[in-house]
C-alpha cells in the first residue's frame, strides 16, 4: 500500500528527519513544496511574490509569467535536486519529477479568479495558476515497481500543454487518490491544525470527514489549503490524512501513529 508524504517548503521545516525516517521504507511517493526557496529566488531575480486572498478566505500566490518561471527554476531545479541528492546520501534511488513530466498532474488554468482588495472583489488578471483535475499514476507506478522513489513537485500541465502553478498540498492529495494510497501525510512546520494559531498546544487532534467544513474557520493562511487537500483526499478514497510536524525525530512514524491532526 503506497504512502504519500508531502514535505513543506516554508521556513521552519526540517527535511533531514523526514528523509532519515523514509530511507528504510519502500513503496512511497514524496511530494514537495518550496515556498521559501521560491520567495528567495524571486527576490533575487527582482520578481517578489504577489499574494491575493479570495472571497472564501484562501490566500494564493499570483502566478504571473515571471513568477511561474521562478517556480520552475526553484522547485524543479534547486528544491527537487536537493531532495534527490539527500536521498542518494542515504542510499535511496530517487527520481525527481515535475507535474509536467509524463502528464503526471493534469490541471485546468484558473479563469475568473477573484481577490478581495480594500473591501472590493476584483478579478485577478495575468495569472497562470491552475486547479488540478487529476493525477496520472502510470509513471509513478513504473518507477515504484522498478525500486525508485518518485519525488514530485509543481508545476502542472493543462490539456493545451500550458504550464500552470498548482498547490503542492492539493497535488499530494490528487496523487494519493490516483495511487489508492491508504495514508497521506502533510508534514509542515507546525504541530497540526491549531484552534488558536498563537497557542502551539491547541492542536485539533481528530476530524471526521463530515466535520471538515466546520473546522475550516480555524485554518488560516496556507493551513487552509492543507485542510482542503485533506478533504479532497478523503473524498477520493484515501483512508486517512494527517497534518503533522517535520520537527523532531521520526516525523513519518509519528505521523503514521496519529501525531498531529488526523482526518478520517
Language-model segments: what does each one mean?
Residues 1-264:
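C-terminal catalytic "cap/lid" subdomain
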